[in-house]
Curated annotation (Swiss-Prot):
A Gene Ontology cellular-component term: mitochondrial membrane
Stated family: Belongs to the AIM36 family.
Protein source organism: Zygosaccharomyces rouxii (strain ATCC 2623 / CBS 732 / NBRC 1130 / NCYC 568 / NRRL Y-229)
UniProt keyword terms in alphabetical order: Membrane, Mitochondrion, Transit peptide, Transmembrane, Transmembrane helix
Topological category with respect to the lipid bilayer: Single-pass membrane protein
Name listed for the protein in its UniProt record: Altered inheritance of mitochondria protein 36, mitochondrial
Entry keyword Mitochondrion: yes
Compartment(s) of residence: Mitochondrion membrane
Transmembrane segments: 49-65
Keyword Mitochondrion: yes
Length: 238
């Protein structure tokens, strides 16, 4: 190998061989390969990710959403205690609430008995007996009434038993409307087969009229409504 290298060195002037690798020669196209060139640097990455300002803004928005969600969860939790200020606020709201018939205008009695015939034998015919089923049916049959579409929708779904599936509070609202149109000061009113729940009882007494008594047949003595009125000493067994 050594003699071979010497022969190559003697074939031409050193300057001629160096010219082959000169920049000028490569520029003119004499040689296409660049032996001494450095590898090209990779193109800079396109950093299109979110900047710091965007990340900071998203963090703030997330914190706000979390706080609002926590507040809503707290509101939905049952309240077992109230501060003195909250208690006074609630009591003031109750005092400002005015029933449709203030105390003393009507004598209203609830009855868990459905049959008005038996009640009339006990209480007489002078009282105004109101059947909630008939009241609701009258509004369902009135095409001009704003509740007619809703009542017929519930009726088409549940049939004759639809009274049990009315939206919460609707029965009390319809009874209040009926009594406003048909009751006069001094009337003695008996509402048959009502209330169906303690919620209905409280809503009625807050928004329509207070009730002086709950008439209870023997088979309904264990109902929640009966027990509720027993605590306030307003129940009477039939």
């Amino acid at each position: 190998m050594l003699p071979f290298r010497r022969i190559l060195l003697r074939r031409g002037p050193l300057t001629g061989r160096a010219a082959l690798f000169s920049p000028a020669f490569r520029t003119l196209g004499g040689v296409s390969r660049e032996y001494a060139s450095k590898p090209a640097k990779p193109a800079a990455r396109n950093n299109t990710g979110p900047g710091f300002a965007m990340i900071f803004a998203l963090a703030i928005i997330g914190t706000v959403i979390f706080n609002e969600t926590a507040k809503n969860l707290d509101k939905n939790k049952p309240r077992n205690t109230f501060t003195e200020e909250e208690y006074e606020h609630v009591m003031q709201g109750l005092k400002r609430r005015v029933a449709m018939f203030p105390d003393g205008q009507l004598d209203v009695q609830f009855s868990l008995q459905k049959d008005s015939t038996q009640l009339k034998k006990l209480l007489g015919d002078s009282k105004l007996y109101i059947d909630p089923g008939q009241v609701v049916e009258n509004y369902r049959s009135d095409r001009e009434d704003p509740y007619e579409p809703l009542l017929n929708e519930v009726y088409s779904k549940y049939g004759p038993e639809y009274l049990k599936y009315l939206p919460q509070g609707l029965l009390v609202s319809l009874l209040g409307r009926y009594m406003k149109a048909h009751c006069r000061q001094g009337d003695h009113v008996v509402i048959l087969d009502f209330p169906h729940s303690i919620k209905d009882a409280i809503k009625f007494e807050n928004e329509v009229s207070s009730a002086s008594k709950l008439l209870v047949p023997k088979e309904s003595l264990d109902s929640d409504v009966c027990k509720y009125y027993q605590t306030v000493q307003k129940s009477q067994q039939l």
